[in-house]
Structure formats: structure tokens, C-alpha cells
């Protein structure tokens, strides 16, 4: 008897304080685009409008939704995919025990109950990628959906995808995903990595981490599982994921050959690509730029090759003294990708793992190859984004962005940070968010989060929260710096609430309302403190904002401009000082 992953075992449903789920009707029947609406209280009887913000949480924050993990979440894209008439259902490959890294299927593994569903693929001769549609002048339902989320015209979305400046990762076998876009002319996105390892985590925990990450604002999820039950864990995640899901297929392929890199073959890897594409993975990290001739260059590095995928392929290349089979079979990979609309995330297997190695010959040699591969993928109308570093000091960050835009013809950049210093284990979410904010400002389209556990261990649920929030700050700061037309609205609303001492509105408008309230209540827990005109930092006498209010009130009472009120008040105080005898200490 197979076990099940019960929703009661883990925390899935939740909402953020002062918020409600709302839906914007799209141009097609039944299209409903989710937003989160943050209510605000009045200011002296004058209403403050609610603020609508981008929402990644899926149905889990909808009070009307009943969580049934065994059924998966709704599939808003299913009718759109079938309606285009260019896909077919087929039997698909047989799921084998080795897909989960075992010789014999375990009775205790909670297999997803709808494993008998038939996958979809493109009909013979068809190409079902969003890039293919865009290049043929077609605005898809997914593009219309994205346009509403981003506050732009559908034609702008189509053009950005057609020209390769943005990707809309949307595997036809992941109809549960709410369409989103990754490109430098849209909101900066954040990816959260989850996944088990050989020594830690369960299927239930990974499903919970996925919903937890999206609750806090993760735009995509990467399942980087390397332990047992890789296939089954991924199935549970995808069927319940409202955001695109990415993977690094070489990890699972390695498990299929018992962890021995030199035993990898193109056939095993190809089978793994098809397996994951049939499940609904939206983008693959593929380390096709780690070429045999680049590997010796890394020998003089401080930290060598730090990418798991990069080191696996380097080991294979050296053992066989052959060129990377991901590079030599790249056209065949493109043929698979366009049958399912899986996007490339071209991996930076030679990224620097220390600031000493930043912007070195190995890193930029690989980038040149990724530019070459981008052109090949685009020839097949397959969507591409480029992965970037890594560890880079602040003064070298801009060069990375400029080179990527030039060499990779403007394809979206997707970076891990970068970390701006190597001396802060336990705080690498901060060292990397500094670099992430900078490179996001310069044009990076998506930031891969870093948690406090980076370099130390597998992140838990709280680490995921910290990592996502830290990177939402970096992404939002970049949006502000780039002048995104709606980015400042939430900042302005929170600043107004702060100045008016609307404490609950301050909490609710923040990226992490619960943490903000928790910190406030540590020193001022009483309910009355939620309306007080001070906090515990300065107290009632020294609150700068309360003093500002007093100045404004004084100006109003004396029919003065604020600057005049300050001058008048200063003169009055000067006279008081003279009348008291002009003594410094009374």
C-alpha cells in the first residue's frame, strides 16, 4: 500500500495580514489573473486606497480553495494549450524504479495518485514554444495573462519574447502554472531553490517548502533534489506548483548511473530530459558550455570549479578525453525542448566560487560558448536565459552584465547573487543581496536566492523565508532604480502610513508583515502601541516624525508655511533663552 502526502502533515494554506486575494478578469473567457490587495485604514476620515501587488502564492492564499495535494491544483492553461490544436497526448515513457534512484520501487514512497495521466507533446512538425508563437505574430493567452500581471500591453510582451529579450517558461505539461515572464524590461524575478539531498528532507517537506517560498514571493522554483525519490518528489511539486519549476537534469542522470560521472551517456541524459519534460518541468539548467579545452584554465583558480553540474561534466570530459556531450548533442536537445516548450537556462558551470576568481578567463570563455548556443537555440525558436555568477566584488559586477548582453545578444540574465565578499558564512543572503540589487539594476532579469545556509547546509523552511524576502528586497530595489512605473507605489503608501503612525498599515504593506509586527511588539506589545505616535527606538519625546507633525500643526495654527513656522519657532526659543539669562546650563 503506497503512502500519501497529506495536507494535514504540513502547513500549506495561509494568507498575509491585511491582505486578500483578488482576481482581475482577462480578455479570454475564464481567465482570472491573481493579485494580492492590501487594505489601508483611513487618515482622519479620508480613505487611503488599497494597494494591489504581484502575487505568486497560487490558490494557497485563496480562502475558498480546498487543498487536496493528491489531486493537484487547478490547471488554468489546459484549455489554452489544447485550443491551439498543435499538441497530442501519448503514452509517454514508462516510469522506472531507477528514476527514483533505486533498483526496486519502495512500498513506502508516496507515489502521486494521478501517475497514469498522459503527457502532451507537439504534433509531428509542430513547434509549441511561446517564442515560436511570438515570432509568428501570435499573442497567446499566456502572453495576455502576463501583460495584466506586469501592467503592460500584450503586444509588448509578444515582441520581447520574439526578440529573445524575455522568456515565458511554460511547459505544456505544467498547466497548473500561472504564466509569468522573465526579462529585463519587466519586474525583476526571484527564484528559490528547494530539493532533498542524500542525507536530508522528505517529499512532504519539499512540497511545503515550495508553497512556503511562493507565499513569500518566489517567482519560480528549482527542484535540485539529489537524494532518493527524485522523480516522485518532482511529480508532487509540479502538480501542486503555481509557478514555473526548473531542474538540473544532470543530477538525476547521475543518480541513474550510481553517482559515477564517467558512466554518464548521452542516452541516459536524453531519457532524463524526456522524463522531466513529460512531467512538466518548465526550464532546464544545462551545462553545455563546459568545454574540454576550458577545464585546464580552472587549475590556477583559488576555488576551481564550484558548480555541481560543471564539475560533473568536467570529470566526464577528462575521463573520456572527449568534448562535453551536452555541447555535441545540443541540436538534439533543442528538438526535445521545442516539443514541450521547455526553456533553456544555460548553466554557468565555470562560474567563480570566490571573489579571487571573478571575471577570469574560464568564466568568460564559457560565456562566449553560451552566446554561440543561444543562437542555435533561437534557430529552433527555443527560449533561452543565461545563468551568471557567483562570487564577484562590487566593482566587477557591471562588466558581467555588459558582457552577457553583448555576447548573448540580450538574452535574459539569471544570476546567483553575486556574492560580493567571501568572509560571511551564515550571512551570505546579505553578501549576495548586495550584488543582486546591483546586477538587477544593471539589467539582470531573475535573481537566484541565497539563504543563510549557503555553503553550510540544506536550507530549512525558515531559511527559505529569509532567502526569499532578502531577494525580494534586492529585486524591488532594482525595479525602483530602473524606474519601473509601478514600483514606487507601495513604497509611497508605506512611507505615508509611517508618517501618519498607521502601524498596522506599515506592517501590512511590508514584504514580511509578520516579522515587522513581531519586532515592533517585542518592546511595545500593547494594543494601544499600534496607534501610538512613537516607537521604542526614540520614545515619545524624540520621535522625529512626531516632531514634524508638531511643526506642521504649529504652522497651521499660526497660518504659516512650514519653513516660516520653523523660523518663527526658533526666534521664540531664542527669546526664551535670553529672558532666562542666557545661561547654557540652567
Curated annotation (Swiss-Prot):
Gene Ontology, cellular component aspect: cytosol
Keyword annotations from UniProtKB, A to Z: 4Fe-4S, Iron, Iron-sulfur, Lyase, Metal-binding, S-adenosyl-L-methionine, Thiamine biosynthesis, Zinc
Cofactor: how bound: Binds 1 [4Fe-4S] cluster per subunit. The cluster is coordinated with 3 cysteines and an exchangeable S-adenosyl-L-methionine.
GO biological process: thiamine biosynthetic process; thiamine diphosphate biosynthetic process
UniProt xrefs under InterPro entries: ThiC, ThiC-associated_dom, ThiC/Bza_core_dom, ThiC/BzaA/B
Pfam families xrefs: ThiC-associated, ThiC_Rad_SAM
Region (Disordered): 1-59
Reported function: Catalyzes the synthesis of the hydroxymethylpyrimidine phosphate (HMP-P) moiety of thiamine from aminoimidazole ribotide (AIR) in a radical S-adenosyl-L-methionine (SAM)-dependent reaction.
PANTHER family: PHOSPHOMETHYLPYRIMIDINE SYNTHASE, CHLOROPLASTIC, THIAMINE BIOSYNTHESIS PROTEIN THIC
Protein name: Phosphomethylpyrimidine synthase
Natural source organism: Bacillus cereus (strain ATCC 14579 / DSM 31 / CCUG 7414 / JCM 2152 / NBRC 15305 / NCIMB 9373 / NCTC 2599 / NRRL B-3711)
Gene: thiC
